[in-house]
C-alpha cells in the first residue's frame, strides 16, 4: 500500500491545493471540509465505466452500491481484496433507482461526493488509474428500504447465510471479468451485469430459509434457529438468530438428570462450524471420543464435559451483531439472551444457572464476551475475553478518541496506524486508519461497508438524523466530531463500569473477579492499548487485580486465552465452573447475579440513541432582541444557529421582509450571531435562515422565529 503522505494523497487534485507539498496535504486535507476538497482539479484522462444490466436480472427499480475492481491482468479481482495486501484499485458508487435493463455510468468529477459520486482507493479518481493492463469486474450490492419501529427509514443489504461480506454477497449482480488496456487517454470500459451470486444450497430444515444459514444436524452438532420477536418488531420484517451447538461425549438427550454447563463462544460468522473450528480442528476427534491423549508419558484424561455454542447473527451492517442492544442494529442482546438462550435451555440438558453460563471469544468475540458479562451479570458467570476490541475509547485502537482532533493524524502530523506486524522486533505498519477507512468507503457509505470501522460506528454510536449511524469523524478527512464521540460513552465498557461502580448497579462488587482479559503487547490492531486503559482505570477504582488482566509481551493478535493450548484452556474454564458451582470451593454468591445489575436496556438505548432521540437533538435557529429599534439602526438582534447533528456544515443568511440581506456566510455550530439593521424598514419581519449540509444528509434550510422591526 502507498504511504499515507506519498500515496493516494499525492493525487493531483489534493496536491494542487498545497503546491505539491505531500506532507502538508496529509495534515491539511484532514482538517478541510468536504467543500474545500471539492475545489481540487481533475486530471484529463477521462476514464469512465459504463455498466448495463442484462434482461431479467432486476425485478424493479433498485437502489444499491456498485464496486468496480481493477486487478492486475490475469488476476481474479476477488483473489485478494484485503486493505493490507491487495494489488487492486477499488472504486465504489451508490446507485439509485436502477431500472431493469438499465444503465449506470461511473465517472469521476471535480466534486468529491461519496453519496452520489465515485470514490476510489488507493487512488480517489478513475482518472488517476495508471495506464496498463487490468482484469476488471463489477459487483452490485442491492439495498432494500426498511422502516424501523422507531420511525427511522434506511436502505441496507440484508445478508442471507453468507456472513454479510463487503462484496459479492449472495444475491449480488456481477459482471464477467474483462481484460482491459487502460491507455491514459479518454476511454470507456463497458461491463454487463449478467450473473447473480447464488445463495448457498442449504440442506437443513431450520426456519427462516437462508437467513442465518440453514444446516443439517449431525450426531455431535445440532443447529437451531428462532424467529426473534424483538428484532422482527424493530426491523419491521422477520429476523432470525441461530446457534451451532456442539455436544459433549456421552450426551444423551433423554437423560435429563445429567446436565452440562454451556460455553457461549463469541466471534465472527461461523457458518456451519462450531466453537474452536469444530469439527475440522485437531481437538475434534478427542472431543468426540471423550479422551484427551496423554503426552510426554502422561496418562490420558477425560475431556471436560460442556456444551459449546457458537452464535449465528449476521446483520445488515456486519457478519455479527456484537451481541448487544444498539440503536442502529436493534435488540440483538435481547434476541440472544432473552429468546435464543431460553430456547437452548429448554431443548438441551443445560445447567440454567449463571455460574454455568460462560462467555468467551477473541477480537470481536472478545468484546462481546466481556460486554455480555458486564451488561448481564445476572445471566452469565464469567468471561474469558481475548484481545477484545476497544474496551476504553481513550484508545480506540491507537486513536485517543476523546482528546484527538483527527482520527487519521497525530498532533505532529504523522499518520495513526491501524494494522501492524513486527519484523525482527521492529513494528511495520501495514495500513493506517485513513487507508482502512478510505478503502471501506469503496464498499459502502453511511457505515454500510460491512467492514470493521463502519460496524464500530453502528454498534458504539447512535443514529444520525438520516437514520444511519452518526459517524464519529469525517470519513474522508478524519476530522473528529467531539459531540458525536460523546454519544459513544454508553458503549465504552470501562466508562460504563466506573460510572456504575457503587450506584444501584453496584458493578464494583458485582463484577469483581469475574472478568478475565488477555491481549498481547504486539497486538496486530493495537487492541492492547484499550486493554491497558481498562486495567489502569478499573485498578484505580477497585484496587490492583480487580479484573484479571494478562498482557503477554510480544504476543500478536490471535490464539486462545493467555496463548494456552486448547485443552489447557478448556480445562481452565471448566475448573472455574466447578469452583464457582454450589458445591465448589468459592460458589458464585446470589447477590452478584441480581437482576438490578442488568444493563443495556433496549428501551433506554433507543431513548438515548434512536430516531426520536435524533429528532430531539435538533433545534431551529432563533433570534432575540430588537426591543427598542427605530428601524434606522441603533438596535442589535442576537441569533442562534440552532442545534444540528455533528458534522453538519452551516451557512447563515439574515432575511428582512422575506428578502435576503447581504451575502450568506459560513457559521460554526454553536456560534452566536448578531445583526444590526442599517436601513429604515416599515414593519418588516427579520429572520435568520440557516442551511445545513452533510454528506449522507438531505440539504436542509431551517428558519428562525420572526421579529417585527417597528418605526
Regions found by a protein language model. Give the residues of each.
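Ser/Thr/Pro/Gly-rich low-complexity disordered regions
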Residues: 606-711
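Short proline/glycine-enriched turn/loop motifs at strand-loop junctions of beta-rich domains
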Residues: 62-63, 219, 239-240, 644-649
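Short beta-strand elements bearing conserved aromatic residues within extracellular beta-rich modules
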Residues: 66, 243, 650-653
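Fungal secretory targeting signals
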Residues: 1-2, 7, 11-40
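Non-catalytic cap/lid and distal C-terminal segments of serine-dependent acyl enzymes
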Residues: 72-75, 79-609
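Low-complexity, serine/threonine/proline/glycine-rich extracellular segments that form mucin-like
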Residues: 59-73
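A short, amphipathic beta-strand motif
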Residues: 47-55
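Surface-exposed coil/turn segments at beta-strand junctions on protein surfaces, enriched
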Residues: 42, 129-131, 184, 236, ...
